[in-house]
Amino acid sequence: MKRILVVTALAVVGLAAGAQADERALDLAIGDLARKDREMPIVLDGITEAAEGALLTPPELAERLDDVQVLFVGESHTDMEFHRVQLRVIQELHRRGRTVIVGLEMYPAAAQEWLDRWISDETLTEEGFLDESHWYRSWGYNWEYYRDIFVFARENGLRMVGVNVPRDVVQTVRREGFEGLSEEQRALLPERVDTDSAEHQQLFRAFFGDEDSLHGNMPPALFEGMFRAQCTW
């Protein structure tokens, strides 16, 4: 039985300053050279396969993912529809017999003890889990957006893992760069964090519109620090 790590959440989506910024970020000519200038209609409640434009059912999507070991499922943090899609993907992969591991952006690896307890300890209440795992300090978004995913994982024995680094590492990278990290902090990161992608920078900047008084005209040094932090996160 093949394992698949489903990583929920992509933080940059939550940085959008408004509708105009959202539209700019969704209309950038970036990515695969063969497709970056193409547009395709999106069908309500449908799954559009971008390479060929085919419409897929959820079971067909799960079948196409048979050889995939790591799957990223993005979100807008406060939009429930994104979380329903994440749950449906996890459900279909589980239904297909995959060993699904749910990777969580909101938790660092150091929180693994509480994620393991959430799955294995029936006496741990939701309130106890949120308190002991520091949900609102680590993440801050309403638990109800994510509750169905956590409950499904618990009821079906799916492992959940924290895939992020501690916030102090991200904050140091933002303020001082990678050279400001201690040896202990550096050991928590991969050998290289890619901050050189021009298209990633273009996408990141698109989320900050001119109408965003806080971020729209930020100095280059501030943008670079935020971008480094985003890449590290």
Identify the role of each PLM range.
Residues 21-68:
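N- or domain-start disorder-to-order transition segments that initiate the globular core
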